[in-house]
């Protein structure tokens, strides 16, 4: 297995940024779309619950409809080659004896994981559906991080979007998928301008060594 050397890693980490405008003429190839989808699918999650569903929007009219319900991101979304809608599962779907969890794992894995997961729901969450919902969103955001970094490895760009009306965007999508519960959006494409210099805390402020 080959790994990026330190120089290439640092360059990639510094070049990745929240792209605020994309090349509207750039169209993803089917290979690129499949690769982005696979990056999303392979994302890690606690107990391997994978409590998400990814909707890849490439249809320009549909992107435009969704963009109309974003806050200050309309032109950026319309310029993107694709828009990934990250949907979260509902807490009821993650109950240990429900259909989703019972059919998610191979039998040999299920007999080991399900009892432990059920115990965690009681000990950590006190069987609170609200806490379980927060847990589900945490897993979705882990996937979002992997997607954005993976897209950078492909030489492409992204922007995570939290500013949108989830109910209105859900209404746009409801004709095509069943009542989506939307965690966030990710605009995807090719940048039209170089990223500005990255601004981050110093190592002293950001990291404590013990």
From Swiss-Prot:
Signal peptide: none annotated. NADP(+) binds at residues 150-155. InterPro entries: NfsB-like, Nitroreductase, Nitroreductase-like. Its EC number is 1.-.-.-. Reduction of a variety of nitroaromatic compounds using NADPH as source of reducing equivalents; two electrons are transferred. PANTHER family: NAD(P)H NITROREDUCTASE YDGI-RELATED, NADH DEHYDROGENASE_NAD(P)H NITROREDUCTASE XCC3605-RELATED. This is Oxygen-insensitive NADPH nitroreductase. It comes from Helicobacter pylori (strain HPAG1). The gene is rdxA.
């Amino acid at each position: 297995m080959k790994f990026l050397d330190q120089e290439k890693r640092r360059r990639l980490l510094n070049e990745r940024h929240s792209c605020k405008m994309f090349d509207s003429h750039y169209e993803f190839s089917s290979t690129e779309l499949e690769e982005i989808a696979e990056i999303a699918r392979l994302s890690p999650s606690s107990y391997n619950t994978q409590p998400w569903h990814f909707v890849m929007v490439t249809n320009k009219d549909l992107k435009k409809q969704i963009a109309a319900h974003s806050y200050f991101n309309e032109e950026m979304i319309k310029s993107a080659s694709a828009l990934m809608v990250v949907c979260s599962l509902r807490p009821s779907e993650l109950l240990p004896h429900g259909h989703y969890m019972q059919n998610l794992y191979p039998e040999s894995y299920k007999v080991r994981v399900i009892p432990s997961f059920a115990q965690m729901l009681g000990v950590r969450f006190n069987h609170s559906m609200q806490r379980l919902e927060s847990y589900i969103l945490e897993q979705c955001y882990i996937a979002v991080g992997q997607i954005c970094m993976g897209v950078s490895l492909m030489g492409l760009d992204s922007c995570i979007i939290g500013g949108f009306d989830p109910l209105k965007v859900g209404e746009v999508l409801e004709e095509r998928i069943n009542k989506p519960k939307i965690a966030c959006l990710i605009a995807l494409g090719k940048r039209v301008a170089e990223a500005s210099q990255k601004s981050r805390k110093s190592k002293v402020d950001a990291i404590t060594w013990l």
